[in-house]
């Protein structure tokens, strides 16, 4: 906030501000003394010079920035950027332009203006009354619609009801009658007034310029009133009505004077404020019509004012209103403070006036069809007559904007507003409103800083003129003219400020002083002249130049009849016009208020009346259309202007309350603002959320992919800035202060929760394969959260996630995701997915019911619930589509990441229980199959060859009656196998994660690889981590500069704890090994049933009680069926082998199986047979051995099965060595060896990680 | 000329003295009024600054409150099941 001194000095020298008077300091310190502490707090600095210059510097730099964008985003003490205009004006009192004491002080100057002042006050009262009536008429809404229709049942009380209705309506009618009466009386009073002052023979001073203005304004009000009343009557009728009133009196000459005054003011651009200009433009045609009621009169008028001048004014206006955005305003703002303020006012006036004119233009040219954007033909089409007509209609109505269009069709509000603005025009309008509002705000903010400077400048101008210039004139030009020099000295007397020098109180005396002495007499005083002084000065100048006769031909300063030299005339003219500027500059706040008031853009009473509806929908409202435009285009340049339209609402509410004085209008505006603000906040949230989500998605997208992609640009997000919006804690809307930031934060939190919920629901309605997509989308969401958290104080992501997962409780280890995963595993994954051992993937079996179709179809969410922009969503859907049809390692990574260490054990436990229950359920079925086998099964004989073997096997496997049991057992085995394989996948993933973690923590824990591949501790008692921190602590503690090393000691202790924790985490067990041990324990309960202990102690090779016999039979029949193309056998995948081999291995039957399995024996027989046959037929190798024909398929399937079984066994041997399993063996010598231990050979499956022993 | 004869200023000297006094009085008045306005301006800015600082404080308290609520729920879930921790 504090401005560097150099800058202040630069500002000082640039603008040569002389603000060093002692008074200045005293004045500022007057404020300072009461709040000495705030200086210290640096809320804002209060040094008067620095403050003035500093903020002026800011003002200027703001102005410069203004030339680039609609908002100079500067930050005040409250760190809120200025993206809104003035919400409320402190005071709109016009104490300079309107005399607060009704010019009663004019009499003090003894200028015999009593009559004139009385007339002015009378006219001003009439204007005030007229304005009130006009607002009454404008806001008048038909109350007939509100009256109830008379039902048949109430016919008897008809008369009473009508009486009631009459009484209701009577009140309204009486008001209208009153208006009419008032209008008539006001018109006649105006006419009388004009008549009184148009008689040159009456010895009355006046009319003065203020009087002219009052006349014009009253005429304006009357015209407006009349037009409001007869909204559908054509214009000539109205004119004629006035004509009757005015032609009764002879007022032509004053009308002519007024016309000349209007034309000159317009031509010289003398009206500082646009409302004044519009008044002149509105009244001028009326005056012209009134003054040209007869041929003779019009001749005399056109003698004074050439027709061309009038036409030029109108033409200029029309063409001006049609041209688009103006770029001329951006010229450098230079000069001193007064000039800047004047310039600022002029700019504001020009811009706001332009919006009015543009608005009127739009209203007069409704869009015929909603889709067509074509504009009406350019104005060059119109001939002058039409332009004139156009002009009158347009500006006749500007005050209310309800422009009556007499083009023969009724226009609706929709046509004039909703469809009438193209995107470009909305943008331009929004920017222009932004310029107006922010310049207005800026000027208002430096009100108290510049006002003294302004007063002083005005004082100096006036004093310079009356003391210096007038003196020169008195001594030269007017020396001989007694009358005129009297006027001049009157001017001096009534306004000169001779600063404490009583000897110079006498102007006559003073005029004789030497120039040098006079120069030194006045120095600036920061006091402005009063309204009465300016009023009198203007009057006297008029008197001077016109010689007391305004009705002379030529303009106010155009006549040379007064005998005043041209240069003096020029000076007088300049000063005359300056005087009228002074008033508006003195009314600083009120002028800004008028110039930045754009509330008219909301009002639509005229169209409500003509459309016969109660209110238009919000889409038709211009402010909302602008808000909508910003939210729809999402233009980075416009986003910060999104609150500007709410200034329009502020303005119109202010207008409704203070000018129109109608409560119901305010209520309507309030309701609309409520609605549109809610909508805005919601849309804004969506935009912000979508933007950051797109950014996150774009960041997480593989950059090498987007680089190679032909249209990779579409995955980049156009940058947007929301900083300004995030900082808005005080948005002023209709007098309320709204914390927009907290609203956004609140809704953002809600949006995140909704999004998480949506993603979880989506996962819940799909199958297990959707887990990768879920994880992807949650990752994007997390990154989005991270980037938004940089600006807003959002709830923590992990808490939100666990809240939505229903996982908050400390004692619950399940969550929505984990229960869904388990649910899916149980009902869909284990029964319906089959394993492919080679690809390490599960895929859905063909016959597996696609039960996702039975579920409720996933609700399609909005784009911002996925990845923000459409392109990114498509890209991510493409990626996740790759993972949708299988379950493998990537899915397992996603599962581990989503469940985390908290919920994962629950799943593992549930899965193990599932295995155990499946085994238990399998026991009776296995027993049934065992019973169907013969008591004793021998080895297959080689004699019969393959065919013989097949026959024998078929004889053994008499399970035809039990095919159902067989299928069930196969399915059970498949589920057990799938579960086990799932565990092994989980194991692989967990190992990988553990390894990563190990690699990260090893250097800190001082772990180094030993000789035998084991991990060694480099240091015996402590780790590098603790050493480092304890060394740092010691160094800090020993240093005398550190007064309180306790926190470092705590840190060192914490380091020890951390290294202990990490150390204990190193040797985490293997999930697969645990699962195998668990299965083994579950099997032990059924050991007696599935494994017959040989009575002799030797291997009983003929027994059929062992499990491997059943599995062998199942495998054989399954293989046989699987190659039979005629029977559509359900594919069970590789998990059956996993389950069978695991069970056999854990029961200690692996070697029995490898020896006595039917398929293995079958393969052996085929091999032998093949060898023998090929031996016999070595000469005829090319001839395929026909005895093997028909068996290739089954042999191939058996080989495959054997390979698979071997793989499983070797894996099992590696992961679960059965050291303490005991069996019997026979030594090569033939001696039996009881209770020998298995020796485990080194696994062939060496790719699996070894168990650390 | 409309203001001929006795229509001019009665006694220019008296009027001049009155005007001079008026200037001085008004200087005093405008000094006072300007400084009242400055005071008011300051109060407005002070209010704005305070409001936004309070708003940011409120925001932080809100966050803490919500976090506390979540933690309370977690703790209550633990205290209602003491058996789990034994």
UniProtKB/Swiss-Prot annotation, chain B:
Coiled coil: 47-81
TM regions (residue ranges): none
One Gene Ontology molecular-function label: identical protein binding
Subcellular location: Cytoplasm, Cytoskeleton
Assigned GO CC terms: cytoskeleton; plasma membrane; SCAR complex
GO biological-process terms attached to the record: actin filament organization; cell motility; regulation of actin polymerization or depolymerization; trichome morphogenesis
Keywords, sorted A to Z: Coiled coil, Cytoplasm, Cytoskeleton
Family to which this protein belongs: Belongs to the BRK1 family.
Task of the protein: Involved in regulation of actin and microtubule organization. Part of a WAVE complex that activates the Arp2/3 complex.
Subunit details: Binds SCAR.
PANTHER family listed in its UniProt record: PROTEIN BRICK1
Protein name listed in UniProt: Probable protein BRICK1
